[in-house]
A protein has these predicted regions:
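Charge-dense, helix-prone N-terminal extensions
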Residues: 1-120
Length: 120
């Protein structure tokens, strides 16, 4: 999916940064990833409060197959097709995705600094 198209699509939401990752791209507002692009589909971050709205729209969560052949489910849901033509409502959904991403990041414990082993 073209980066200019994504920026135009999210223009009413605000400045979106796109970072390539794992064959797709992450959608960022500042340092917070609130969405992703995979196989030309956009997915937005959801939590227990916002996931039901995606379910009502019959949207599926993002899944991938691990290196061990298991299917992994992530808390990103496919953007409803109708939002591609409604920038105002898309901006609302994007703000909710950003709030869910911030809430999820706040729940995570801070990462431990890696220590170097002493050579013997």
């Amino acid at each position: 999916m073209d980066a200019d198209f994504i920026r135009e699509l999210f223009a009413e939401f605000g400045d979106v940064h796109i970072r390539r990752m794992f064959g797709g791209a992450g959608l960022y507002a500042g340092a917070v990833m609130f969405g992703l692009v995979s196989d030309d589909l956009i997915y937005l971050k959801a939590d227990e409060e916002t996931a039901p709205a995606f379910e009502r729209e019959r949207c599926a969560p993002f899944t991938y197959t691990t290196k061990h052949g298991k299917r992994a489910l992530m808390s990103y849901w496919r953007l409803p097709d109708r939002l591609y033509d409604d920038p105002t409502e898309l901006a609302l959904w994007a703000r909710q995705a950003l709030a869910a991403a911030r809430k999820g990041a706040a729940k995570k414990p801070p990462s431990k600094a890696r220590t170097r082993r002493k050579k013997s």
